[in-house]
UniProtKB/Swiss-Prot annotation:
GO terms for molecular function: chlorophyll binding. Belongs to the ELIP/psbS family. It comes from Pyropia yezoensis. One of its GO terms (cellular component) is chloroplast. Keywords: Chlorophyll, Chloroplast, Chromophore, Plastid. Possible role in chlorophyll and/or carotenoid binding. SUPFAM superfamilies: Chlorophyll a-b binding protein. It is found in: Plastid, Chloroplast. Gene3D superfamilies: Chlorophyll a/b binding protein domain. The lineage of its organism: Eukaryota, Rhodophyta, Bangiophyceae, Bangiales, Bangiaceae. Coiled coil: none annotated. This is Uncharacterized protein Ycf17.
C-alpha cells in the first residue's frame, strides 16, 4: 500500500502550514494599516 503524502487532521505538517498562513495574514493586515492609515474593519465597511 502506498503511503499518502497528505494526512487529514491535526498533523505536524498541517499545523506548520496553518501557522505560516496565519503569519502572512497578520503581517498583511499590519502592512495595509500602515500604508492606508486606517484599520482593516474600517476599510471593509464594518466600522464607520
Amino acid at each position: 500500500m502506498k503511503k499518502s503524502l497528505w494526512l487529514w487532521g491535526f498533523t505536524d505538517s498541517a499545523e506548520t502550514w496553518n501557522g505560516r498562513f496565519a503569519m502572512i495574514g497578520f503581517i498583511s493586515v499590519i502592512f495595509i494599516e500602515v500604508v492606508t492609515g486606517q484599520g482593516l474593519l474600517y476599510l471593509i465597511g464594518m466600522m464607520s
